[in-house]
Amino acid sequence: MKKMTKKAADRKFKLGMHSYTLHLSGLGESWGFQSEGKTYAFEKVIDLDKFMDLAVEEGLEVLHITLVDLDKDTSPEHLEAVKENAKKHGLDLELNVSFNAPSDPRVNATIEEALEIGHSIGATLVKFSTDVEHPHPISHSCMCPEAMTQMAEIVNNFKKNIPTIEKYGMKIAIENNYDLFTDEVIWIVEQLNHPLIGACCDTINSLVMSEGVKECVDKMAPYCYCVHFCDNRVFADPDGTHSLGCAIGDGDIDVVEIMKILREKAPEELDTIDLEIELPLSGYTLEDGRKEEITAMRKSIKYMKEVLGIGTTEK
């Protein structure tokens, strides 16, 4: 990449965190069990109040939360209490929803429901996973007819809700969440062609769609209103090729170069970088896994602040 301009090099972002980072503690989403044909939910040992306390202690500025973190309680009283609690903690909130999550239906919502919930908690952004299904083999299925039919319906549904999006003034982000190729996310955003609607780039999800990480970030950066900032170790052994989540800076994703791309190419609507870690589920007890998540979170926050220059507060 060419040398960054001084303006880009000096660009600041708030430091946020996706609640999925602590999913073993019952936050975010209990993901990954769909292959077993059943749903499973980790016991919640950290509720949203404790999560906000932890965020302040660790120097986070934004929490990227799901309906699981709201305990699926969308009563006006509860959502107003969440909004006020975030204000009291000095935290911004972003809402993460899916249309048809395969293993944890608690995170699912319609566009209409998500907009109302996001507005009620004072969210600055609502991120959508579209759960578009592609035929196999997947590597060459980008923009295939089966996917395009689903995407066209999604575009039309968002268009119907643009008056509400404008009324509430929340940013909207469409994610490459194991279900959309980079070009498909961009197609949806360009079809909607609205200043409040952009993309959410997860820095490792492209691997599942047989895409390169650098190429994905390069393409999506100009559209990014949201980033799930991940690092993974990628390796092969006799059991196959693996991509395992780890603390930021410990993996095979060049996170320094990714931040250079985002600082140079992302629009001003991208004001937050959300840490996300997906540690492996195997190799330790559940209790030890929860401790590992906290350790990886703290190591990542330190790296993102000290090495990547992310964060606008002194703590």
Language-model regions, residue ranges each:
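Acidic-and-aromatic substrate-binding clefts and catalytic sites of carbohydrate-active enzymes
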Residues: I65-H78, F99-A109, H136, N176-D183, ...
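A short, acidic, flexible beta-alpha connecting loop/helix-capping segment that sits on the rim
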Residues: E276-E293
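Hydrophobic faces of well-ordered beta-strands that scaffold small-molecule active sites
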Residues: F13-Y20, L63-I65, L93-V97, V126-F128, ...
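Acidic/histidine-rich catalytic cores of soluble enzymes
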Residues: L63, N156-D252, V256
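Charged helix-capping and loop-helix junction motifs
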Residues: P76-A81, N108-E113, C144-V155, E211-K219, ...
